[in-house]
């Protein structure tokens, strides 16, 4: 591990805010130098051994006082140069201007064991010039959610930022969890999150909105140089290729979300990664009964802009915002349309690929998409758990005596189950007919479905149970969840409880079905 050699390319290349203070202000440059605010009693709650290994941390270092001091913001390793990044964004469809890292401080980059440079950020590290009067801290509940979901998504095979550590600060902050006029003290924590880049769509939108074409161009050139080094060429041709790849990655990302039933909850353009990573875990969730209109975010309860079924369309809209921000760099902005068309084509291809895999087909034809959509309709009307429905289907054979027995654990409402039983049996007959002409051998079909349909997903009620235990000083559930989510596609003996459908007590419970951006 030693010596750690930190690189700081973002701040070495891009212009710095000349003012050195925490005063909230409009910043015209790309970043501001700012140090983390120390915390009173830091305590390591959890860490990811896989991320630590990638970053070349020795296992012994992870439990030392020095590690805890650094990743709580109380100290720095040599070579770290902390800073906060400036960006803007569209939130819930409206341009809101400058946002920036209001409670995130980047420490620098480390060269990983895989040959990739990774940025290390502390989320909840204290105020910055972008905090807009807030305290720059993060509560324990949201920090646990980000830590666990970062790692769970990675092991599901979904592009994501990662998490190195979760550290309690020993302090409390005041938060109004549901924005309903009931603020209360909550314990705070800091997550060290890790990614090759945290550049967002909003990074480019802000200078474009201000007419600062020089900074816009410098940001684009830097991002291509650092994050897309495989792209070659110059000028508009290079920019077109770059934007098209962003569109491709974003389409693949959202297709993965739809495959596993993940709902991001707050797909603002400042929460969209330029690398096509899942970023900024807030009021996210996994759908239970396949309701395309469901969102876990109470802030979005009326418009449901970021509901599960709308995520592909929202991603496309966000890419349109990015295209408009980049347009000043082009003599003919129409060339960006090819990238947007790339998104459509990539998403449709990924949708077909994933439908075939989830149903166990060798390939997906048009009528297979109709069959897939029909199953989604059945799941919704019968109130069936999406994860358990596909899991049961992977073990089904046409000669089973009771065709619905495979879904015994998937139903949330026995009345709806009985009412929709004829429709479900009809669907299974259609499915059996399709399987009879598919070339995949049975064993290969089962394996294909197993790899596409997770057994374990990070259901909100599981996370909430871990949060409530951790708030009382019990970390057993936190560590158990972290371990289970490392192998989401495998049967894990003794871990069956983590694969169960949402219990009835969690249907309308805060933290389980209702979340907010309060963190």
UniProtKB/Swiss-Prot annotation:
Binding site residues for ATP: 100, 102-103, 123, 135-136, 193, 200, 280
Organism: Xylella fastidiosa (strain 9a5c)
Chain residues that bind Mg(2+): 271, 280
Similarity field: Belongs to the SELO family.
Key words, A-Z: ATP-binding, Magnesium, Manganese, Metal-binding, Nucleotide-binding, Nucleotidyltransferase, Transferase
Reactions the enzyme catalyzes: L-seryl-[protein] + ATP = 3-O-(5'-adenylyl)-L-seryl-[protein] + diphosphate; L-threonyl-[protein] + ATP = 3-O-(5'-adenylyl)-L-threonyl-[protein] + diphosphate; L-tyrosyl-[protein] + ATP = O-(5'-adenylyl)-L-tyrosyl-[protein] + diphosphate; L-histidyl-[protein] + UTP = N(tele)-(5'-uridylyl)-L-histidyl-[protein] + diphosphate
Required co-factors: Mg(2+); Mn(2+)
Family matches, as PANTHER family: PROTEIN ADENYLYLTRANSFERASE SELO, MITOCHONDRIAL (PTHR32057:SF14)
Taxon lineage: Bacteria, Pseudomonadati, Pseudomonadota, Gammaproteobacteria, Lysobacterales
Short name of one Pfam family: SelO
Stored InterPro entries: SelO (IPR003846)
Class of this enzyme: transferase
NCBIfam families membership: PRK00029.1
Keyword Nucleotide-binding attached: yes
GO molecular function: AMPylase activity; ATP binding; magnesium ion binding
Primary role: Nucleotidyltransferase involved in the post-translational modification of proteins. It can catalyze the addition of adenosine monophosphate (AMP) or uridine monophosphate (UMP) to a protein, resulting in modifications known as AMPylation and UMPylation.
Protein name: Protein nucleotidyltransferase YdiU
EC numbers on record: 2.7.7.-, 2.7.7.108
Active site: 270
